[in-house]
């Protein structure tokens, strides 16, 4: 009887761990999402890229976005 209960509890624990792991995989940030650090959990093949914003020579903070790895944005020449 104890063996059956132990086996049932072990099986329940394994199923719960698999479910939690599957939910965590879906929690990544998609392309274009705002991230906070360079390792912020963007989905696979995406990188958190940050840049500093300036308005009239005054720094207005830093923005970070999930973009494809290797992609570089540059300022548009006017």
UniProtKB/Swiss-Prot annotation:
Main location: secreted
One Gene Ontology term of the molecular function aspect: toxin activity
Compartments (UniProt record): Secreted
Residue ranges the record assigns to the propeptide: 23-26
Gene Ontology cellular-component terms listed: extracellular region
Keyword match Cell membrane: no
InterPro entries: Spider_toxin_CSTX_knottin (IPR019553)
Pfam families: Toxin_35
Tree of life domain: Eukaryota
Signal peptide region: 1-22
Distribution of this protein across tissues and organs: Expressed by the venom gland.
Posttranslational mods: Contains 4 disulfide bonds.
Keywords: Disulfide bond, Secreted, Signal, Toxin
Sequence similarity: Belongs to the neurotoxin 19 (CSTX) family. 07 (U7-Lctx) subfamily.
Protein name according to UniProt: U7-lycotoxin-Ls1h
Organism: Lycosa singoriensis (Wolf spider)
Lineage of origin: Eukaryota, Metazoa, Ecdysozoa, Arthropoda, Chelicerata
């Amino acid at each position: 009887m104890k063996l059956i209960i132990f086996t049932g509890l072990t099986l329940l624990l394994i199923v719960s761990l698999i479910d939690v792991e599957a939910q965590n995989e879906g929690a990544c940030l998609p392309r274009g999402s705002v991230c906070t650090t360079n390792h912020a959990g963007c989905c696979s093949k995406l990188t958190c890229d940050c840049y500093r914003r300036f308005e009239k020579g005054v720094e207005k903070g830093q923005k970070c976005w999930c973009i494809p790895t290797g992609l570089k944005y540059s300022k548009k020449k006017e």
